[in-house]
């Protein structure tokens, strides 16, 4: 084929290729319109269809305007800004036939907006969702922060793998009583509990779990994603039942503890390692820290001090638990 013919054929393919989907259904009768967000953007042409066998005497209205917007079974609108979103309803006489609700997902300079959630600055990457698991049962908790109080809705979806996804069930997002203060501002904390349906605690993970949060504020839509292996988000509960036993003719004491009840069993397979530290008066920490695999240690315990113990998976460098403590006095 002549080079000029190749160029013409390639151009034909480009022109005939279907455009990227700029509007898609989030849930029944709710649609997301994806917009390039800059003053010169043309917006998106959206065709709404009235869900009725009727053909005649159909009119359209929206919750943004009291005027009749058009007539007929379909309505074509140009969506350029939030004033063009909202609920569109088709009527016949005084009867409502159906409605469609339009949300806007903004893209500025090629980047999807992240206005609804607060970035959690704990790594080099932008993180909006944080997830933790107390053990290898496949159950985990995710949370996020927002400064927004009203007109807010979250929906959470999760699966492991994409080609043949394994089911992960998530509950409803709930507002925590805990307020989180960041940069002198209080943020609301939302949490969700998820459970992998066919989790095998001892199995090696080959595919990550993906969590997607659909966030809606008024007429704005955003989504946030986190992808991880359970082993990477493990954070045990603190050790339990800390006890001190004085040692004869010694300044040392023996501190002992037990595995947390929520940790995976058997402990001979799902083993923990422990960090032990003496904290002095006024919460001053001694620099030396013991690392032990057994559930006891000998330390010097001064008056007014306390001993702290935390736990971590012995064979994988995931997160340490919070501290458990016992007073020396």
From Swiss-Prot:
Pfam family example for this protein? IL12p40_C
Location of the protein in the cell: Secreted
Q: Which InterPro entries match?
A: FN3_dom, FN3_sf, Hematopoietin_rcpt_L_F3_CS, Ig-like_dom, Ig-like_dom_sf, Ig-like_fold, Ig_sub2, IL-12
Q: Which PROSITE patterns match?
A: FN3, HEMATOPO_REC_L_F3, IG_LIKE
Q: Identify a single GO molecular function assigned to this protein.
A: interleukin-12 alpha subunit binding
Q: Main localization of the protein?
A: secreted
Picking any one GO biological process from the record gives: interleukin-12-mediated signaling pathway
| KW Membrane (keyword) present | no
The signal peptide, as residue positions, is 1-22
Residues in coiled coil? none
- The answer to whether keyword Glycoprotein applies is yes
Question: What keyword terms does UniProt attach to this protein?
Answer: Cytokine, Disulfide bond, Glycoprotein, Immunoglobulin domain, Secreted, Signal
Oligomeric state and interaction partners are given as:
Heterodimer with IL12A; disulfide-linked. The heterodimer is known as interleukin IL-12. Heterodimer with IL23A; disulfide-linked. The heterodimer is known as interleukin IL-23. Also secreted as a monomer. Interacts with NBR1; this interaction promotes IL-12 secretion.
Give the similarity note: Belongs to the IL-12B family.
Q: What does this protein do?
A: Cytokine that can act as a growth factor for activated T and NK cells, enhance the lytic activity of NK/lymphokine-activated killer cells, and stimulate the production of IFN-gamma by resting PBMC. Associates with IL23A to form the IL-23 interleukin, a heterodimeric cytokine which functions in innate and adaptive immunity. IL-23 may constitute with IL-17 an acute response to infection in peripheral tissues. IL-23 binds to a heterodimeric receptor complex composed of IL12RB1 and IL23R, activates the Jak-Stat signaling cascade, stimulates memory rather than naive T-cells and promotes production of pro-inflammatory cytokines. IL-23 induces autoimmune inflammation and thus may be responsible for autoimmune inflammatory diseases and may be important for tumorigenesis.
What name has this protein been given in UniProt?
Interleukin-12 subunit beta
């Amino acid at each position: 084929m002549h080079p000029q013919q190749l160029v013409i054929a390639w151009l034909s393919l480009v022109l005939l290729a279907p455009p990227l989907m700029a509007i898609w259904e989030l849930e029944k009768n709710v649609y997301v319109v994806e917009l390039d967000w800059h003053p010169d953007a043309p917006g998106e042409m959206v065709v709404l269809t009235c869900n009725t066998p009727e053909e005649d005497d159909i009119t359209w209205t929206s919750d943004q305007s009291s005027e009749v917007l058009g007539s007929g079974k379909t309505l074509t609108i140009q969506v350029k800004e939030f004033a063009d979103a909202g609920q569109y309803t088709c009527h016949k006489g005084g009867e409502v036939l159906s409605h469609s609700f339009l949300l806007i997902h903004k893209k500025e300079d090629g980047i999807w907006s992240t206005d609804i959630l607060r970035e959690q600055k704990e790594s080099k990457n932008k993180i909006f969702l944080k997830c933790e698991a107390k053990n290898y049962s496949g159950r985990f908790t995710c949370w996020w922060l927002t400064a927004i109080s009203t007109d807010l809705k979250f929906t959470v979806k999760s699966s492991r793998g994409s080609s043949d996804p394994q089911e992960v069930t998530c509950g409803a997002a709930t507002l925590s009583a805990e307020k989180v203060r960041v940069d002198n501002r209080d943020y609301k904390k939302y949490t969700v509990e998820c459970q992998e349906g066919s989790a095998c605690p001892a199995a090696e993970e080959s595919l990550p779990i993906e969590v997607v949060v659909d966030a809606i504020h008024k007429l704005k839509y955003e989504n946030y994603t986190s992808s991880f292996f359970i082993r990477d988000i493990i954070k045990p509960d603190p050790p339990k039942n800390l006890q001190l036993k004085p040692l004869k003719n010694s300044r040392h004491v023996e501190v002992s503890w037990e595995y947390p009840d929520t940790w995976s069993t058997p402990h001979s397979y799902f083993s923990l390692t422990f960090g032990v530290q003496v904290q002095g008066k006024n919460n001053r920490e001694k620099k030396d820290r013991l690392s032990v695999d057994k559930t006891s240690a000998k330390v010097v315990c001064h008056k007014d001090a306390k001993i702290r113990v935390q736990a971590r998976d012995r064979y994988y460098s995931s997160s340490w638990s919070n501290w458990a403590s016992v007073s020396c006095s």
